[in-house]
A protein has these predicted regions:
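N-terminal regions that are enriched for targeting/export leaders
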Residues: 1-19, 25
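N-terminal Rossmann-like or analogous alpha/beta NTP/dinucleotide-binding catalytic cores
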Residues: 37-40, 45-49, 57-112, 118-123
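Glycine-rich phosphate/pyrophosphate-binding loops
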Residues: 39-55, 353-354, 370-376
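Beta-rich, aromatic/charged-enriched effector core domains that present basic-aromatic interfaces
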Residues: 87, 92-208, 399-402
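Glycine/tryptophan-enriched, flexible segments
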Residues: 147, 153-305, 432-444
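Structural beta-sheet core signal
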Residues: 21, 51-53, 138, 401
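Active-site-proximal binding-pocket segments
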Residues: 237, 241-435
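N-terminal catalytic cores of NTP/NDP-binding nucleotidyl/phosphoryl-transfer enzymes
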Residues: 16-40
Length: 444
């Protein structure tokens, strides 16, 4: 593993004892840099390794089916780990308290964990680290170019981070080594997850997205064969999209972006426009979102908006709105806009919304809300509560782009939006067959 992927975030004296990998973002056994690093450390120290997962009692507005997606996937990951002599332990409660209790309980000598810049994960770490008396190493397994290696500041937009990432890609976009075999087996008694009880508790995941690493790889192969060849032409067409449909798997860490990039680069018969267009989204735009959250602690508030956008939204705060939507109206997909309603119903039915539509969807919420603060809060509640890929850096950056001009520039001034870019129903009709999309989701 490239040493720039790991950093010591809790400097405590080295101790003898097992290695614990606190898995909270990269929920997979394959292609997992944090797991690989933890296994290397355990083998080098002559110590056993286990993986600890803490199911928080709540995760913002996430719904039971989101936990079901996670738990179903974890059951498969646990089987893969067990086959390699690595137990997966699942604890319940507040991660900032429960993980240190577990680490102390097994007399661990070292803890490895996932890097994650989102607000809730920062809070978990802030609570956990003072309670740990062992070194803690954080590994960036989410980004192909580790976020802290790509840039040391918040980037203005894609064009400012793109050359930095492209320069470093040859150094980081490499194949994955095999997971190091464990020389010392885990023998300490640890509770094994009661999968039957957990699956009963959370119910079924959304039918549109079968969970787990195997399903994620199958979805990737389907995309490579069916959708990637036409990605350049159809990626922004919600009716018959060439979208990858990988975002839930990437969000839950059941599939790594680096594996996706390697498969895309190896795929045969793909034109450069399709290949480059997809890799721009997979690498540059995703890692720009990571950069935004890493260097903007208030990434889920209007404080994250650039000064020009904050000023223009304030200037137009009192503009008359064409419609003031109620919360219940939005959640039910019962607005005056048929395209918005269809997008919301797609989200309600599948846990997924097409990427172009999500931008349009958020901008209409701004148009129908008394102010940008209310609009952002509403979008966060709906996106984080309904979307399988919610509660993610890409969602925070995307909503900040849609409502607050983050990673964008001023556009011609309009009512309500000011100089923040607007998107309209008439513009959507010029782009794709809106009537066909509305008809598809009218009864959802």
């Amino acid at each position: 593993m490239h040493p720039a992927r790991a950093r010591l975030i809790h400097n405590r004296p080295q101790q003898q004892g097992p290695v614990v990998y606190w898995m909270h973002r990269e929920f997979r056994a394959a292609d997992n840099w944090a797991l690989i690093h933890a296994a290397e450390l355990a083998r080098g120290r002559g110590q056993p390794l286990c993986v600890a997962v803490c199911l928080a009692r709540g995760f913002g507005p996430a719904r039971p089916e989101h936990f079901a997606f996670l738990v179903h996937g974890l059951r498969e990951t646990a089987r893969e780990l067990e086959a390699q002599g690595i137990p997966l332990v699942l604890v319940r409660g507040e991660p900032g308290a429960e993980v240190p209790l577990f680490v102390r309980g097994v007399r661990a000598g070292l803890c490895v964990t996932d890097a994650d810049p989102t607000r809730i994960k920062r809070a978990w770490l802030a609570q956990a680290l003072p309670r740990l008396d062992v070194p803690v190493i954080e590994v960036d397994g989410r980004n192909i170019v580790p976020a802290r290696a790509a840039s040391d500041k918040r980037e203005y937009m894609a064009r400012t981070i793109r050359p930095k990432i492209q320069r470093l890609l040859p150094e980081f976009l490499d194949g994955f080594p095999a997971l190091p075999a464990q020389g010392v087996p885990w023998t300490a008694p640890v509770p094994r997850p009661d999968w039957a009880a957990l699956l009963s508790e959370f119910g079924a995941p959304p039918a549109a997205f079968p969970p787990g690493e195997t399903a994620a790889r199958a979805r990737l192969e389907a995309f490579l064969g069916l959708s990637l060849p036409r990605y350049a032409d159809d990626r922004d067409t919600p009716v018959e999209p060439a979208a990858s449909l990988l975002s839930p798997y990437l969000h839950f860490g059941q599939l790594g972006a680096q594996r996706v990039a390697l498969r895309v680069l190896a795929a045969q018969g793909i034109g450069p426009e399709a290949r480059d267009g997809f890799l721009e989204q997979l690498i540059i735009r995703r890692e720009l979102a990571e950069n935004f959250c890493l260097f903007t602690p208030d990434h889920d508030t209007p404080a994250a908006f650039p000064a020009w956008a904050a000023a223009t939204l304030e200037k137009h705060r009192a503009d008359p709105r064409p419609h003031l939507a109620a919360e219940a109206e939005l959640e039910a997909g019962d607005s005056p806009d048929p395209l918005w309603n269809a997008a919301q119903r797609q989200l309600l039915a599948t846990g997924h919304m097409h990427g172009w539509l999500r931008m349009y969807w958020a901008k209409q919420v701004l148009l129908w809300s008394p102010d940008a603060e209310t609009a952002l809060a509403r979008c966060l509640r709906l996106n984080d509560g309904l979307s399988l890929d919610g509660r993610d850096v890409n969602g925070y950056a995307g909503l900040a782009w849609s409502i607050g001009g983050v990673h964008d520039r001023p556009w011609p001034e309009r009512a309500v939006f000011g100089t923040v870019r607007s998107m309209t129903l008439s513009g959507a009709r010029r782009k794709f067959d809106v009537a066909a999309f509305v008809a598809r989701w009218a009864g959802a």
